[in-house]
Regions:
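Metal-dependent polysaccharide deacetylase catalytic core of the NodB/CE4 family, i.e.
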Residues: 7-23, 42, 63-67, 75-177, ...
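A general structural signal for short secondary-structure junctions and capping/turn motifs
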Residues: 2-3, 195-198
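Acidic, His- and aromatic-enriched active-site or binding-groove loops in soluble protein domains
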Residues: 71, 186-195
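Terminal accessory/targeting
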Residues: 1-65, 77-80, 84-110, 211-330
């Protein structure tokens, strides 16, 4: 299938369920149930991680849009509220687990017994989310590898095997981190930048739409389900880690041919509490250069690009950079 004709896979990322004190990482159960109904109403099918793996490795074509459901951190509220619904409805999902809190028997997290229940269900697949769930980008390589290996030992002890799929803590990754994840044998790795997965996507920079109390509202969730991929041939810079000496970075993207209305692309970026438009210019029919104006003052820098493919469907590309020299509190 030609890249511009792919409808792709919408990755949804959840954390907490009905923990209303944490709106940025929580989804209300009423909203979650409504979201599942909306997915069914729009006649979208869920995809298992095994089928998704085949798709991004080029072993399977998808002729209709699919939805991949993922959950990060193994909060107890997932097991208490969402797991019974997913089990009843037979919805496949991936549960990414950071093992330190599980080992410590933190009451806010699931237990190893509960994780084994999901692992053995044939429905939920357990993913790797590091040991500490710390701000890892910027660590020395030995320390980074030791953290991941410690979690791998926990998985081997408790589940009998090491997960094949990885989720970067806080969605942060650098070229070095990505290469370490590859070297350790993982098949896929997910970030927290928004966007639709197409078959050309880097298998170690896979996007997901974070769903929370804001993005979980019906109108915004419907918009997410109506998005299409924005496939590209080349993306520069290859490293998503930004040094204080190259802040802000210049971006250059070569999109695939055939993207209708690409000339209408608009990109915005987070600058404090606002999302100003990023100046851009076409250097060829399908190649765009983005020149953010102001240096980023936050550790996590985001750029979102979109344009209308039809009155109801937008193409969407989310980008996340990490500035490890800036405190995570900013």
């Amino acid at each position: 299938m030609e890249p511009h004709r792919e409808q792709g896979v919408i990755g949804l990322m959840y954390h907490k369920f009905d923990e209303n004190k944490y709106p940025s990482t929580n989804v209300r159960m009423k909203d979650f149930k409504d979201q599942l109904k909306m997915i069914r109403k729009m006649k979208l099918d869920f995809i298992s991680i095994e089928e998704f793996d085949d798709y991004v490795h080029g072993h399977r074509e998808l002729y209709n849009k699919r939805v991949l459901l993922t959950v990060d951190d193994a909060w107890a509220s997932f097991y208490r509220h969402a797991w019974p619904i997913l089990k009843k409805e037979g919805i496949p999902f991936v549960l990414f687990i950071n093992t330190r809190e599980i080992n410590q028997k933190n009451k806010n997290y699931m237990s190893w017994a509960q994780i084994r229940e999901i692992h053995e269900s044939g429905l939920g697949v357990i993913g790797h989310h590091s040991y500490s769930h710390d701000y890892i980008v910027g660590w020395e390589e030995n320390r980074l590898r030791a953290d991941l290996e410690r979690a791998s030992q926990d998985f081997r002890r408790e589940l009998g095997s090491i997960p094949e799929y990885f989720s970067y803590p806080f969605g942060e990754y650098s070229l070095e981190f990505k290469n370490i994840v590859k070297d350790m044998g993982f098949r896929l790795a997910f970030g927290q930048h928004s966007g639709v997965v197409d078959s050309r996507k880097d298998r170690f920079e896979l996007p997901r739409f974070p769903i929370n109390e804001n993005w979980g509202k019906a109108d915004r969730f419907e918009m997410v389900l109506n998005t299409l991929p924005m496939p590209y041939k080349e993306f520069l810079p290859a490293d998503k880690k930004v040094s204080e000496f190259k802040n802000p970075p210049q971006l250059e993207i070569e999109f695939v041919p055939g993207l209708k209305n690409l000339k209408n692309i608009v990109c915005t970026t987070n600058d404090g509490d606002s999302w100003p438009t990023v100046p851009l210019r076409f250097v060829s029919e399908n190649r765009v250069v983005l020149d953010p104006i102001n240096p980023y003052r936050v550790r996590t820098a985001r750029i979102n690009c979109s344009f209308a493919d039809s009155p109801k469907h937008f193409r969407w590309l989310g980008i996340q950079f990490v500035l490890p020299h800036i405190s995570a509190d900013k």
